[in-house]
A protein has these predicted regions:
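FAD-site-proximal beta/loop scaffold in flavoenzymes
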Residues: 127-150, 221, 225-230, 236-316, ...
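Glycine-rich dinucleotide-binding loop and its adjacent helix/turn
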Residues: 109-174, 209, 264, 270-272
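A conserved FAD-binding loop/helix module that cradles the flavin
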Residues: 270, 284-349, 434-451
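A Rossmann-like FAD-binding core segment of flavoenzymes
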Residues: 28, 72, 77-98, 105, ...
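Rossmann-like dinucleotide-binding cores of NAD(P)H-dependent redox enzymes
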Residues: 61-62, 154-155, 162-218, 303-307, ...
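Short hydrophobic core segments
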Residues: 9, 83, 105-115, 158, ...
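Beta1-alpha1 glycine-rich phosphate/pyrophosphate-binding loop at the start
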Residues: 2-75, 168-191
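Flexible, glycine-rich terminal cap/loop adjacent to redox cofactors
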Residues: 2-4, 9-13, 17, 23-28, ...
Length: 451
């Protein structure tokens, strides 16, 4: 009788979280992880900070080596091994190694943690040297090597999402003339009102040229290297280095070919136990959908924290956890540093709330981060989204301090399905160095008849 084996496809956040949780659940289970690249167990979110020089070297992002998993946890790690085909009915995965050798691996249970891939539009000139995406460790390795060899002077970033904003700061830290080109009329598409305006002001105040409402159509070269970025209106921007940050897509090709159900978002459909539509096949991380607790809809939310937590659930259940582990879903909480600004959001934007069918409203409030008499306080701008019953639907904040942690209070309120008047009754911490007597959260949620 063949021994039970858990096979995990993908060796970064969700995949290794699944493998480790499976080991905690079943100490004697055979566990193997296959990873198509040469890198595992690293914090990709830190890549812009290595590019900027804040973090000294790429290796600082590596959390554990393959030997750690093999020797400390008896988890087999197979690098440079690409999954080619999943055969759920036969409990087999066909793989190919670097040497082009093909073989079949048996599984009792399978966890898919194939992640997401950076979108690189097939624009003219996208193959020129100096045009990059930044998603995986080897992307950072290539980009750093290019900077060291070519010594670029001017950088263009295509897209004003999270990676675009972080890379703007990284390139300015290196002294590059930096331009962000965004096809929509605002940065970070889900930010509304004055919150997004503050981000643009900060970028421009740091000598980043921000070009909104312009679509990039081509990259022009000098020889085999990028030299200019051209927009639909005919404008051209000098660039010796370009980062394309227009988003990512779920890496689901192998799952789709195996007949697994794919949702409207393009990601793998999973339930609260991280089970897919195929027996004994689980999925976790950026390749799968999850429940949005505010809208009640299945969404694709590719961020590290949900990926790890989904990995824990998938790994536990794939290893036979009793009772079954469950993933409670997301409310969509995240934060980004934009030079001196902290920018954070949770829940739905006004547009997302309206699309989800809510009769949604929004309002903004600005208040101090500390007591008025305490030195070095700054202004925090808060935008809250709610429905006509007063139910909180989302929040966005921007300021130079005290934002990234305060947003978690709103996230907790969303998890509890609270109304803004209930949130306004919270007993929050106060001391002059940390908050005014009435915290920005309480000011933003106060009844309209209060001063």
């Amino acid at each position: 009788m063949r021994k039970e084996q858990l096979l995990v496809i993908g060796g970064v956040a969700a995949g290794l979280a699944a493998a480790m949780q499976a080991r905690r659940t079943a100490p004697d289970l055979d566990i193997a992880v296959i990873e198509k690249t040469a890198d595992i167990s690293y914090g990709a979110c830190g890549l812009p900070y290595v590019i900027s020089g804040l973090i000294p070297k790429l290796e600082n992002l590596v959390i554990h080596s393959p030997e750690y998993f093999r020797e400390q946890h008896n988890i087999q790690i197979h690098l440079n091994t690409e999954a080619l085909e999943i055969l759920p009915a036969r409990s087999l995965v066909r793989v190919r190694t670097t040497g082009e050798e093909k073989c079949e691996l048996h599984f009792t249970n399978l966890v898919l943690a194939t992640g997401a891939a950076a979108i690189c539009p097939p624009l003219a000139g996208h193959e020129l040297a100096g045009v990059f995406v930044l998603r995986q460790l080897h992307d950072g390795r290539r980009l750093l090597g290019f900077i060291e060899q070519e010594r670029p002077r001017a950088a263009v970033i295509v897209g004003a999402g999270y990676i675009g904003l972080e890379m703007a700061e990284a390139f300015r830290a290196r002294g590059f003339a930096t331009t962000i080109i965004e096809s929509s009329d605002k940065v970070m598409s889900t930010l509304g009102g004055a919150v997004g305006d503050r981000v643009v002001d900060e970028l421009r105040g740091q000598d980043v040229e921000v070009v909104l409402g312009e679509k990039v159509v081509a990259f022009e070269g000098r020889g085999d290297r990028v030299a200019r970025v051209v927009t639909e209106s005919g404008r051209a921007f000098e660039a010796q280095i370009v980062v394309i940050g227009v988003g990512v897509r779920p890496a689901v090709e192998i799952a789709k070919a195996a007949g697994l159900e794919i949702g409207e978002s393009g990601a793998i459909v999973t339930d609260a136990m991280q089970r897919t539509s195929a027996a004994n096949v689980f999925a976790a991380g950026d390749c799968c959908e999850t429940l949005h607790r505010v809208s009640g809809r299945r969404v694709w939310f590719p961020l590290a924290q949900p990926a790890v937590r989904q990995g824990w659930v998938a790994g536990a259940n794939a290893a036979g956890a009793t009772p079954e582990a469950r993933f409670a879903g997301v409310v969509g909480t995240n934060a980004v540093k934009v030079f001196a600004l902290e920018v954070a959001r949770t829940g739905l934007s006004l547009e997302e709330a309206q699309t989800a069918g809510f009769d949604a409203l929004s309002r903004e409030d600005e208040s101090a981060s500390r007591a008025g008499y305490y030195p070095d306080g700054v202004k925090i701008l808060t935008r809250i989204i709610y429905d006509k019953s007063g139910r909180l639907l989302g929040a966005q904040m921007v300021g130079r301090e005290g934002v990234a942690q305060r947003i978690d209070v709103y996230a907790a309120a969303l998890h509890a399905n609270l109304k803004i008047e209930e949130l306004n009754r919270f007993d929050l911490a106060y001391a002059p160095p940390f908050a005014p007597t009435i915290d920005p959260i309480l000011r933003a949620t106060k009844p309209n008849d209060e001063g």
